């Protein structure tokens, strides 16, 4: 056989089975597969076997470096489900992983916070859950780093809790607050998950529901420990501090108690949790911390995880122990070796190499068997722990029942004979406990042969026995104290005997269960002893194989050299890592220095901002003071015009004076609002300056026109008007002085000017001339004609709508027919309501005329009240015109040639016109008139029918129009951002267009009022009105009513018939 010398190191380093690099690569591969299978985008819960492999990997490498190296590369911002499952896996790693995992996760706090903030700003259901979950994880990491006495699993004894709390009341107080915050984060996550689930169906059996519910198992485990610790700490605080100081703690605990109890109750009702976890039940009410003895009644909630069922596929080993060559790479290495050195003589491999490989396989097989035996032992130990925990819970429940019985016995102090019988029964139970203690001590002796983990089980069991002995001692002391009772009431003997029998039955049942558990414990101990024997045999076989391997160590010097070379490379790599860590620490120091500098700059910027803010306040007040000074000059100039001889030839009308005075009063209200806004925000005086400018001009204009009006008025009213104008100017100047003083500005009294302005307004009303009696022969006829024409137009509109409804039934079907019928029915109802309104208004007008005309005729009454008559005519025309326009719009909508918005606008116009008609009728009506009450009811009916038209139109429009659903599934983050910006641009354009159209609508309305005020007389309007006689042909439209041209008379509107004209300033 040819011997090969000086084998290249690169060939030796690729031989599987002994290289540390190959073992590390296999470990990394296993972890990568487990992480990719556990954290994916499928909406399903994380499988337990993948999470368990990741947790075992943290124990293998004593940290979470590998986990975070793969987790950083996951595309968490792209999928909310991926982020949710990452948080779930991280929670399990924190709870069950190696203790160093906590410090490794501390380095990636910023990554966790960024993921939570990212999904918190997006409207995604899983995203909102991820935001809450990341806050919980950050709180958990901070708490356990601050309190290293508490492991991430939160499972500590009461002694460790006492040691962590210490004796300082401040530390206990702070620790309790931190545990409250911890519990709030846990409960908030559970509430967020349940809020997204539909409890009406079995969501816990669906993969989507289980994906959300799976992390709540860890939440239940955390909450049970946190609840127990907070109860202990609160009792300790109440023993040191007064109750009033801890009122806030008690309120917060009660709120958390009810939330936790509802959480446990809802989780217990779900099928998903019943097979995975045993959830404890909390008592009906929270503990009473004001009573120190209530601590003995507290029972620690115990969460039990049932034994996991065996999985179908075998778990993957952390170290490759396969007997066959790896796929791909070993074949390539063998071919390269043969091509370089040639095949060996007679065989492919050397006999020694084959023997070495067979021995390696045997060693690996024995090692795997040893690992299996260890895993089985750990599984047995976990099962025994769960049984002991269940037994502990049952014993606690039994102790509580005994305490309740003792409380009843204390209340019934007269049961001496029965208590002695109970004492004998207690001695019998004590004998049973002593026998159980002897058996437990024997079990402890057998378990001392196992590892240190078995001693922990024996310690827990002995602690339980000691608690039982203490309970028996307490029972004996209580019974001895009961012997002092002198009298016994025979009436309660039956009740005590019944309590005794129940306690005996329960005690016997618990003793039988305890004996059964002892027997099972002994059986498990025997199985563990047999496993120990098999382990010893395996170790002997391993020693024999080791001796055989030692004989072949001389031939493995070359391999040892290669290993030493690899170790040297590893040391070099470690030195490189240390250098990298040193550079990283320097970078962190530099970052901290830069942070300090930035904080200094921030403080400087804040001081500059404060100075600029003060400067802005000064500048705003300077602008306000300048505006007030300018306004004072304008008012002073207006007051001086009252004594100016050149102003004597200037005249004005009372109507114009009234309009200017009313505008000035409105400007006073605006000035008060601007003053209030300025006091709220001293940095913005724009509203106050604008209001001040407008007020000064309007007040000056009112003063000037008041003087001009007094030139044509009688002497006495003219003198009073001049005096009022001077008083208004003086009060306005006083107000301007207050605005210029920074101290008096806050107490400005705008009411100083309102009183003289109201006086000017009242004098202007008194100076108005009375209306002239014009067209005595025409006004009455015009009113009757307009009311008759309006009724006829409404009748035609009702008939036309019925014709359109018949045509729509023949021309359309389906959804369109349903929409058209609904719209036309609502229009018909509206027309009927308007017809009833017009009829009632006519009756009310007749009543007004008959009650108010006296000895005069009807024509004379209308002529005497010409303004009221013109308003009535205008309102009647507006109703008729609105009804006609509504019919036209409905016809266009049914024929699909019009817009739904036209119908809505016509409905609003009809409502406004009927309101105008009602207002015109109510002016001279008696408030107790039955016709007026019916008119008001009809007006409300018209408004309701108009609202029905609008509602049916909008619903029909939404029913017919197709609505495109927004689909964002194929859009990336960049595309979404681009479309968001484009949509914002479109929104701004539409808002600008909307503002322009609103301004145009305002100008049209202004022009409409101007034209309405400047139109001809009512007699002329009647002359140009077309005939409103109904037509017999149903296919033709009813006559089109003319839009009213006589607008309701306002105080500031003028009419040439009044004989008064606006003021004209003439200079001679």
From Swiss-Prot:
Biased composition (Low complexity): 590-600
PROSITE patterns: ENTH (PS50942), I_LWEQ (PS50945)
Protein keywords: Acetylation, Actin-binding, Coiled coil, Cytoplasm, Cytoplasmic vesicle, Endocytosis, Membrane, Phosphoprotein
ENTH domain ranges (all copies): 23-151
Region of interest (Disordered), residue spans: 424-443, 529-549, 582-608, 1016-1060
Region (Important for actin binding): 867-924
Location of the I/LWEQ domain: 771-1012
Positions of post-translational Phosphoserine modification: 1017
Chain's role: Component of clathrin-coated pits and vesicles, that may link the endocytic machinery to the actin cytoskeleton. Binds 3-phosphoinositides (via ENTH domain). May act through the ENTH domain to promote cell survival by stabilizing receptor tyrosine kinases following ligand-induced endocytosis.
Quaternary organization: Homodimer. Interacts with actin; homodimerization promotes actin binding. Interacts with CLTB. Interacts with HIP1. Interacts (via ENTH and I/LWEQ domains) with BCL2L10.
Similarity annotation: Belongs to the SLA2 family.
Protein name: Huntingtin-interacting protein 1-related protein
Lineage start: Eukaryota, Metazoa, Chordata, Craniata, Vertebrata
Gene name of the record: HIP1R
